[in-house]
UniProtKB/Swiss-Prot annotation:
Substrate binds at N267, G324, I325, L326. The gene is sucC. Residues 9-247 form the ATP-grasp domain. SUPFAM superfamilies: Glutathione synthetase ATP-binding domain-like (SSF56059), Succinyl-CoA synthetase domains (SSF52210). NCBIfam families: PRK00696.1 (NF001913), sucCoAbeta (TIGR01016). This is Succinate--CoA ligase [ADP-forming] subunit beta. It holds the Pfam family ATP-grasp_2. It comes from Acidobacterium capsulatum (strain ATCC 51196 / DSM 11244 / BCRC 80197 / JCM 7670 / NBRC 15755 / NCIMB 13165 / 161). ATP binds at K49, G56, R57, G58, E102, A105, E110. Heterotetramer of two alpha and two beta subunits. It comes from the Bacteria. Succinyl-CoA synthetase functions in the citric acid cycle (TCA), coupling the hydrolysis of succinyl-CoA to the synthesis of either ATP or GTP and thus represents the only step of substrate-level phosphorylation in the TCA. The beta subunit provides nucleotide specificity of the enzyme and binds the substrate succinate, while the binding sites for coenzyme A and phosphate are found in the alpha subunit.
Amino acid sequence: MKIHEYQAKDILAKYGVAVPRGEVANTLEEAMDVAKRLFAEGAKGVVVKAQIHAGGRGKGGGVKVAKTLEEAEQYAKQILGMQLVTHQTGPQGQKVQRLLIEETAAIDRELYLGIVLDRAAAKLVFMASQAGGMEIEEVAAKDPSAIFKAYIDPAVGFQAYQARQLAFALGLKPTQINDAVKFMMGLYKAYMDTDASLLEINPFITTKDDKLFALDCKINFDDNAMFRHKDLKELRDIAEEDPLEVEASKYALNYIKLDGNIACMVNGAGLAMATMDIIQYAGGMPANFLDVGGGANQQQIEHAFEILLSDKNVQAVFINIFGGILRVDTLAHGVVGAAQKLNVKVPIVLRLEGTNVEEGRKILKDSGLNFIVGDTMQDAAQKVVAAAKGQ
């Protein structure tokens, strides 16, 4: 689950992590009230920041520095309500429905801090880099040595000596080391207490008077742990999420919309990724990732079908099922029911193997509907790509 920057900063502030003074605003009037208050309290400028669930806001024109109240009003009018396009939103962009108005900081250095799970090491890793303000993936690709890492032993947690090592690696001044250690320990505690899956401070800044701030931050939470955090669950902003993904989550379906025209319905995340790969290998483009899981019932299959066909870009559907816990006949009943109910106009290609596969194939054959069956994954992928092209 993603949250907004202002929400992440509110959480971090409770753990003693220094963040700039600021408040969220939902209207122009609220934005100006915050800006007036900050200027009255001695701010030399304010930053007007679009609040959307995407990175690259600055490059897209969603972050502006205002040195006067007039400039703040100009930028707030410009950004609030705009369709902000970044490298993470896609060409359609995301509508800005709220702003964060913050006091500017006298930046001396821009650094990076982050905590994430390293699956290869089976441990959390606390990362730091002197290349702040840049995408960390870009830094890792160009110069992996620029990222310093401290692996966290789950038995003892993140230790102060590790924080000191990272602080020295960042080249912080001796007078800043103790504050940096407290800063990092606060980040780690926030990460653990909230069942986060990602925590990034980018940039983590030092100021000309040797203070440390989280100038921008991002926190994602583990969806599977949200039953323990009702307060955090309330921070979810459904308006920032894809409507089809929101609909899928209601039925415990793992759905992610993509940019292609071949819809995929698969059981199992690994097979789903392999299915997307083989579609591309055959010359097509997947329209989504959809894992219906091993315990899907007929009703979930029907809902999955409705969601797939709600995407206007879909020209064909590829159903790739290896029946184990999810029996093939159960899937077949769901597919036939959905196809009849929705009066499906696009070609449907199936590759079926596993438990009750013969019963499933018979259900499809007896339905009288024009399903296309592939003998293998490769055969089915080639058929669905051809069908999407109208061949």
